[in-house]
Amino acid sequence: MDVLNSIGFVNFWGVTPFINLFETEDELIKKTTINEPVNVLISNSNDLRHFIYTIYKLFVSQKEKGTEYRPINFYIHEDHLEVLCRDLLFLHLITDRNKSIIERCEMLMEIYGNCLLPSRTIDYINITYKLLISFICQDKKSQPVYKNIIDLSCLTHKQIDSMQEIFSSYDSKYPYDIEKYRNDRVRYCLKDRYDYRKNLFDWDYNMNIQNFAPIIRLRYYIFWRENGIAFVMRVNQYKFPNRTLACYIEGKKKQGHDSCMVRGYWGDIVNSPYLSYGLELETREEISYFYANNKIDYLRDSQDVTEYNLVKFLLRMDHDEKYDFMKREKEKERLRQERIKREEEEQEKKEKEEQEKKEKEEKEKKKKLKPIAEQEDEEEEEICTDSQETKERKEKEKKEKEEKEKEEKKKKEEKEKKENEKKDEGIIIGKNDNIKEMTKKLAKVVNESKSSDTTEESLIKAMDNEKTYDTNELIQAFREVKFKIFLVGGEIEKNIYKKKKFKNYFDVILYGFHARSKFNEMQKSILKPTTRLLFELNSYMASFEEKTRKEYRENLVKMCKNNGFVLDDTSLKYLYQFKIKQENQQENQQENEEENEINTTIESNVTESTNA
């Protein structure tokens, strides 16, 4: 199998789990006398998982420990603008408080990893893409909730126009046969082995994925490899194509070999979208919900883990509430048992009806076999018995009706007496009473009558007001954690490395797996002496063997050492962290001081010349 083709030319989801870019006790981000913003670059991570998790952790530490942090500037860079458009769509969905948290999470999972979508998500996309177009075009009428946290200044006019075209292509009126495009990709990768693809999918799982991610179940992985559907919610029918996964890449024509742009599905067909949110958990208690025997046996699958993580993040960031997983599971069990009971009762009713029908049919057959005289005698006897029973039943019904009418009359009389007493108490006015006193007494009577009738309604409204929240505001974490998102598209060398604005600018840089090739000597210009470098690894990618994974790690460490970086002890299995050597730090500081001195001398000379 061609590895590069199977990974995809345009990646729509991450290949590593989420991480916190700042530790909770990190001195870099703590608020001090220096309140300059911390600048973070996230390049080609393919989604917002690192951003969401860092904001979640900072918000939790602010609430629990009371720590204050410096403002943060997140520069989210993607080579392909289609991925940036998806990021904007996910931000809109996360901040959409008209939807419940569970609805938001389910729609996010479906748009994130499914090639086919249900009708409700398609309707939502058809509404939101118009709002996103108006936001990108800076229409004054469109004032979304997230307008103050997203900055488009790093995008060119040409990129904004192309993003507008991408959003307009989300409309369901434009055809996009994603099943055909994806099947062509699979057929091209497997070639002669396409007819035996299920066996190959099984091989990839057992030889690669099962070793590092056993919670990804075999049947779900094979179902995704074959159909492109990773997350199945309830009883939805997945029929409509996910147009957010459409993109263009450069290709060549068969005749003449002229270059052209080819539209299709150019994403991942091997690794699966379970890796980003469906593997890692924070605490041992959470691990006990999904695993047993120290992560050897699993109780649930990766879809449950992704749903748990997303609901936990959004519930805490929006409502500042902890997610009680076991309580929700008990409610699910209760609802499931009720549904089972209902189904059993319905089956019993159907069986009884069928038995009654059979008995009637048998009786009719027997009647036909009996002689006519006997049938007439039996019919007369049945009529007599029926007439007696009907008479007795009618008499009982009459007695019951009379009793009910008597009770209703008594109740009405009692109500009328009480109302008359209230009117007499409230409305009777003395000769010496003023008009103001009259109005006061009348108002008391009216208020008492209204309050007695609407006590339940007022309680319901009060409960609703406690549950509802302002839909025109950001979620709580986005309001309290000070940050801003800058979207950057296109080549990183042209849009970041070569710009003077970003010289010695970034404090933290995270490179996705596909951005490793963009790391070169030009990258040193944007670094500070204390910059931390983070690199995503291919530890959880099924398209690589164990040897190639080790070689990739070794080559990455060598490359960073040659450029003056040292591997940090806080590195993870799926992510390496590097720091600049102390010698290089001193050299960089000297260079910065010399540059500052030169700039000051130039400024002083300019001022002297202007004064002269």
Residue ranges, per PLM feature:
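Periodic short-repeat tracts
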Residues: 405-407
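Cationic, low-complexity basic patches in intrinsically disordered or flexible, solvent-exposed regions
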Residues: 586, 590
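Intrinsically disordered, low-complexity proline-rich tandem-repeat tracts
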Residues: 593-594
